[in-house]
């Protein structure tokens, strides 16, 4: 049990490594910001469509058949999008980055910091939700077969490094504090060992493929919405459009290679 929990903790703390990479730079240039956010978009879109959502389809079709399970996965996916969209609309206009400003530069700087803060917190929340069932899955793999669990944990750790960057970059820009940015990045990853512990104590006797599949589908929807509504527009608005797109492609490539390494 300690071995399984240790593997899960290792994978979760990798977000802190990503945060450390993001805050190690002395200044955050527009190019670095655009590239990092674009990279994060690539990571989140690829992992959502290639790993999380197909996993939801597999879980749900195994219970409700091809048609019923597919419908459930699609509903869960768009349900996740609707949930985060509603939360976004409930944010007061004064701090909502989607509301245009009619005031000058000082307010624009204030709105930029608010946008970055909101983006970082929402990204941390989405990653934490994603890491919760992921941690439980890593823990179960560690309990069942250590030879399978080790490459799974390493692959998840590789995934978590760019996710830590996704959290730390906007929060460093918003707060000006490397310590806070690194703390949030690390905290989002600690959802992984928390998922392992809570899952072992409470969920394991009750959770079934239906709940797990719907959870995966909704998390994929949340991550896609954040990517296209928050991360990508901010990356492009930096004025470094091509840098953002190159970062996006690089993020997808890193995720693809990390998945292929452990097939």
Swiss-Prot record:
InterPro entries cross-referenced by the UniProt entry: ZIP, Zn_transptr_ZupT
Chain positions recorded as Zn(2+) binding sites: 134, 159, 163
Transmembrane intervals: 1-21, 37-57, 68-88, 116-136, 138-158, 184-204, 206-226, 243-263
Keyword field contains Cell membrane: yes
Residues that bind Fe(2+): 131, 134, 160, 163, 192
Catalytic activity: Zn(2+)(in) = Zn(2+)(out)
Keywords, comma-separated and alphabetical: Cell membrane, Ion transport, Iron, Membrane, Metal-binding, Transmembrane, Transmembrane helix, Transport, Zinc, Zinc transport
NCBIfam families linked to this entry: PRK04201.1 (NF003243)
Family: Belongs to the ZIP transporter (TC 2.A.5) family. ZupT subfamily.
Function (record text): Mediates zinc uptake. May also transport other divalent cations.
Protein name listed in UniProt: Zinc transporter ZupT
Gene source species: Corynebacterium glutamicum (strain ATCC 13032 / DSM 20300 / JCM 1318 / BCRC 11384 / CCUG 27702 / LMG 3730 / NBRC 12168 / NCIMB 10025 / NRRL B-2784 / 534)
């Amino acid at each position: 049990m300690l071995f399984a929990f240790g593997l899960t903790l290792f994978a979760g703390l990798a977000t802190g490594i990503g945060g450390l990479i993001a805050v190690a730079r002395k200044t955050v240039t527009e190019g670095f910001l655009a590239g990092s956010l674009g990279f994060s978009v690539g990571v989140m879109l690829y992992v959502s469509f290639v790993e999380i959502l197909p996993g939801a389809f597999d879980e749900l079709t195994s219970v409700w058949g091809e048609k019923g399970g597919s419908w459930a996965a699609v509903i869960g996916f768009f349900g996740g999008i609707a949930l985060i969209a509603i939360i976004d609309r409930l944010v007061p206009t004064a701090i909502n980055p989607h509301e245009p400003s009619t005031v000058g530069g000082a307010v624009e700087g204030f709105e930029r910091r608010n946008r970055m803060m909101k983006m970082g917190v929402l990204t941390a929340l989405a990653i934490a939700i994603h890491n919760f069932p992921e941690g439980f899955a890593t823990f179960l793999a560690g309990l069942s077969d250590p030879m399978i669990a080790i490459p799974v944990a390493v692959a998840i750790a590789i995934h978590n490094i760019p996710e830590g960057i996704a959290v730390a970059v906007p929060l460093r820009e918003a707060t000006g504090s490397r310590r806070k940015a690194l703390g949030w990045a690390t905290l989002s990853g600690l959802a992984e060992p928390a998922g392992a512990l809570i899952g072992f104590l409470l969920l394991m006797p009750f959770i079934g493929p239906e709940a797990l599949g719907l959870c995966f589908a909704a998390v994929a929807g949340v991550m896609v919405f954040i990517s296209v509504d928050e991360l990508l527009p901010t990356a492009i608005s930096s004025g470094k459009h091509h840098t953002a797109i190159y970062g996006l492609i690089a993020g997808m490539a890193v995720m693809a290679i990390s998945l292929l390494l452990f097939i």
